[in-house]
């Protein structure tokens, strides 16, 4: 989704928090409350595609729903927060990537992600996930990182496979999709020592 930089809901490169350049054209940075409108609009504009694999899409009825989600995360102490990162190119939002379940006691976390169709097939998400794995190990002290993907979602499954994650098994009927059907989830993991050998 293209939004002019003068628009209040444009994706701003220079917000506070962690940010990093991902390849020559793309960046990630921590999402802020100011991003709620552009995140919601991007999801809304791509809802037919995204709802196939992301059951939360139908629950985002208005910008306030995205604001509530971000507020919930931002209210937590930083060490306990499941940090969400925007993926951007200029003032365009391409998708989100972040930590969805973090267990600080056992030093493990899970990464979730989505990318709108026009940016898929370029290796963007693979680079983002790799970067966040390295960051989770070096900055957050994680030992194990997990990714769960619907078994039928080939693009999402390709990312952990490409990065050398181990397929641990299948969580049978692990997620209820928007169409009312349960789908199996492939569960992948990678360890700190494996990430350090990339």
Model-assigned labels for residue ranges:
Residues 75-80, 165:
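Short loop/turn motifs at secondary-structure junctions and domain boundaries
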Residues 72-76, 135:
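A generic secondary-structure signal
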Residues 1-38, 42-49, 84-198:
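Acyl-donor (CoA/ACP) binding surface of acyl/acetyltransferases
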Residues 61-62, 77, 195:
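A short hydrophobic/aromatic micro-motif that marks alpha-helical segments and, especially, helix-coil
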């Amino acid at each position: 989704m293209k939004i002019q930089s003068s628009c209040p809901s444009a994706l701003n490169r220079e917000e506070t928090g962690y940010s990093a350049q991902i390849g020559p054209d793309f960046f990630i940075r921590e999402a802020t409350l100011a991003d709620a409108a552009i995140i919601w609009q991007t999801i809304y504009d791509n809802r037919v595609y995204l709802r196939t694999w992301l059951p939360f899409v139908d629950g985002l009825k208005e910008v306030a729903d995205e604001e509530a989600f971000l507020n919930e995360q931002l209210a937590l102490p930083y060490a306990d927060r499941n940090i969400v990162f925007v993926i951007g190119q200029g003032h365009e939002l391409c998708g989100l990537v972040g930590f969805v379940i973090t267990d600080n006691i056992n030093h493990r976390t899970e990464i979730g992600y989505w990318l709108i169709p026009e940016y898929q097939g370029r290796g963007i998400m693979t680079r983002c996930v790799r970067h966040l794995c390295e960051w989770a190990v070096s900055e957050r002290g994680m030992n194990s990182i997990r990714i769960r993907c619907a078994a039928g979602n080939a693009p999402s499954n390709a990312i952990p496979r490409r990065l050398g994650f181990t397929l641990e098994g299948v969580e049978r009927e692990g997620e209820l999709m928007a169409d009312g059907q349960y789908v199996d989830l492939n569960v992948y993991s990678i360890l700190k020592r494996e990430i350090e050998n990339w």
